[in-house]
Regions:
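Alpha-helix C-terminal capping segments
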Residues: 30-35, 131-134, 222-225
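Phosphate-binding/switch region of NTP-binding enzymes
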Residues: 139-214
Length: 229
């Protein structure tokens, strides 16, 4: 165990970010705004939207062997960390489904059993933790969006958007990623941007700077903005 005085701590110049939205909203397209060289794992086959762009290396997850492919991708990313500025996993929602399907193939029913869900929860937390600890690398995760119902102390119920990750582990996952951003589109202007602060209808957080919203092309430009007078 290492001890350090808080005044000696320095804010990292690297970031870990999770972006989520409904399918087709532009999550994968956002990756083109990362600066530097990017290594990306395509879990859902949507990387074609990045065709022709420079400085992006894409590995494609084999849906028939997702567990080993994820382990191999981490091994490659760790070994070649000095060659890339960014590592992207696109997307966790589909990887979750592939993992459960893979582990259900050898059961009598051909479906994942109850124990597999708990094993996956542990696996996902461990996986994100080790990727977050890659040295000198920005890490970006994507996920589809889901909704959950929340009850206030007053008894009022409301629906909240959040990443489409298993309910029992999603809070933990969102807790260990400093930025969780929901991508939305303005229906009037067509402009896309990210919510970076939580409200009753959306889960979002930003522990890296004071921004509450960012245009799609500005998400990765980390830094405080001047407060309004």
């Amino acid at each position: 165990m290492e001890f350090i005085q808080s005044e000696e701590m320095k804010r990292s110049e690297y970031f870990n970010i999770m972006i989520y939205a409904k399918p087709g909203a532009g999550k994968t397209t956002t990756i083109k705004y990362l600066e530097g060289k990017t290594l990306m794992l395509d879990c859902d086959g949507t990387s074609k939207v990045l065709s022709g762009l420079p400085d992006i290396t894409i590995a494609t997850l084999n849906p028939r062997n997702p567990v080993q492919d994820m382990a191999d991708f981490y091994g490659y990313a760790k070994t070649h960390a000095d060659e890339y500025d960014n590592v992207v996993i696109d997307n966790l929602s589909h990887y979750q489904k592939l993992w459960l399907m893979f582990n259900g193939r050898n059961t009598k029913s051909g479906q994942p059993e109850l124990q597999h869900y708990g094993i996956f929860d542990t696996h996902l937390i461990d996986m994100i933790s080790v990727f977050n600890n890659l040295a000198n690398t920005n890490i970006v995760y994507t996920a589809w969006e889901n909704t959950r119902q929340i009850q206030l102390e007053s008894g009022q119920l409301y629906n909240q958007f959040l990443p489409d990750i298993r309910e029992k582990v999603v809070n933990h996952v969102m807790g260990i990623v400093p930025v969780v951003a929901r991508l939305i589109r303005n229906p009037e202007t067509g402009q896309r941007g990210f919510l970076l602060t939580e409200n009753n209808g959306n889960f979002a957080k930003n522990q890296l700077d004071n921004r509450e919203f960012a245009l799609q092309e500005d998400l990765f430009k980390i830094g405080d903005i001047d407060a309004k007078a």
